[in-house]
Amino acid sequence: MGIETADFGRTGHASTRVIFGAAALGAVPQRVADETLDVLLRYGVNHIDVASSYGDAELRIRPWLQREPDRFFVATKGDERTANGARAELRRSLDRLGVDHIDLWQLHSLADPIEWDVALSPGGAIEAAVEAREQGLVRWIGVTGHGAQIAATHVRSLERFDFDSVLLPYNFVTMQNSYYAANFEALYRTCQERRVAMQTIKSIALRPWTGRPHTRSTWYEPLERQDDIDLAVWWALSRPGIFLDSVGDVGLLPKVLDAASRFTEPPDDAAMTALVERSRSEPLFV
């Protein structure tokens, strides 16, 4: 039932290739969060990715870190773009998590060009991140983002600063966008060469809700059937060296973990094309 592990970039940590995306805990009670922990432990997941903006998620994780203090590689994210704002945001995250340091702190959703320049210039959030690393509050520094341009933006970010990790969307439908795919491949090569951990999201995204009732806590409509989720997860995991952040819905988490635990070989393009046609998948970003 275990999920394979791989070196998380240059950090020296062997992370499960499926990372728990803790956005799923943003609006659930502690009882549900604790049931989710039991699921993670059953599959051996050892890496948690949360954010200061994920509702109560940091608070929900706090008891886990007290109960299992050495089990998880802990990552959180901050949305502030100035150094002063980022310092305050990090202090708040540490307090909410109940820890004196974390493994990875990420500049969250860094896509807007003006925000990008502010965050990565003197007096920006990156200044606070480096300072926090020097003080032992964080061990590693990463950057995340969404959108059709984010792979290209991450390439620029790695030219500006030597980030230890990146995070961005990756699924079969998104990679049919030639612009995104070309920039993703360039980013992938850079990450492999420089031992930058590459985290991917939206593996089981189906399409935008577009007026349909929201039956899941994800902001997009996800795949639901286990066999469809199997194909999507296996396709993502078939790329060597990448990690998959799970899903922002606790009800779907067991399906993603189950799929990952049974991964042996990738589906071919014909199987993935059939999935797209059968499920009527649509891109989230254009």
Question: What is each residue range found by the language model?
Answer:
Residues E58-K77, A125-G136, T190-E193, T200:
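Alpha-helix-loop-beta-strand connector modules within alpha/beta enzyme cores
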Residues A23-L25, A51-S53, K77-R81, L107-L110, ...:
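Active-site beta-loop-alpha junctions enriched in small/polar residues
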Residues L41, N46, D162, A182-V286:
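Structured C-terminal cap/extension of enzyme domains
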Residues I61-W64, T153-S157, V256-L257:
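Hydrophobic packing residues within well-ordered alpha-helices of enzyme cores
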